[in-house]
A protein has these predicted regions:
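A short, solvent-exposed beta-edge/loop patch
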Residues: 108-150, 154
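Short, internal acidic amphipathic alpha-helical interface segments
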Residues: 22, 36-38, 79-121
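Long, continuous compositionally biased terminal/linker segments
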Residues: 57-87
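Extracytoplasmic/secreted envelope proteins and their assembly/folding machinery
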Residues: 28-35, 95-101, 140-143, 147
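A mature extracytoplasmic/lumenal domain signature
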Residues: 46-48, 68-70, 85-87, 126-130
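Short, highly charged C-terminal tails/helix-capping segments
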Residues: 158-164
Length: 164
């Protein structure tokens, strides 16, 4: 019985540091820090209407944004992060662009492509949920996944395969 109690205490003590490192929301300062830790240049500001954090960031030559959603408290801490990047088509959107968007979305598990026809832009986004608590490693891996989504998106839309 003493061994069982000792084992339960040890498990509880080992779990405590992991729970302390769990994050269920990020402030603007924390968002900037995790993006910087991932090797990305980022500038965090606030949304003019909601005062929620918004980051403008660079992944190589690609500019993207991270909009923080589902925020509470002061400073605002947000449990949902939406990463997105938009690209100029250089022309009006065509039916083949919609086919390419659909093909990307059919094949890609992470990330979602979309068209902004009134702006002649095409884009991709990726949502990261923190609600319920996630580790710093989980956040880091999701940021790396986002850069992979950008690469897959650019590769897909740079291919010569019309409608695929």
């Amino acid at each position: 019985m003493k061994k069982l109690v000792a084992a339960l205490i040890a498990v509880t003590l080992m779990a405590a540091p992991a729970a302390a490192q769990s994050k269920s929301a990020l402030t603007g300062a924390e968002l900037g820090a995790v993006l910087s830790a991932a090797g990305l240049q980022a500038e965090v500001t606030e949304d003019a209407q909601t005062r929620a954090p918004v980051a403008a960031a660079q992944a190589g030559a690609i500019t993207f944004w991270v909009r923080a959603l589902d925020c509470a408290g002061t400073p605002k801490a947000c449990s949902t992060l939406m990463f997105f990047a938009n690209f100029d088509l250089g022309r009006e959107a065509a039916p083949a662009d919609y086919q390419k968007v659909n093909a990307f979305n059919d094949r890609q598990v992470f990330g979602r492509a979309y068209l902004l026809p009134k702006r002649n832009e095409i884009g991709v986004d990726y949502v990261m949920e923190l609600d319920g608590g996630v580790s710093a490693d989980h956040i880091s891996k999701n940021i790396a996944r986002w850069t992979d989504v950008i690469d897959a998106f650019i590769g897909h839309f740079s291919s010569d395969e019309a409608g695929s």
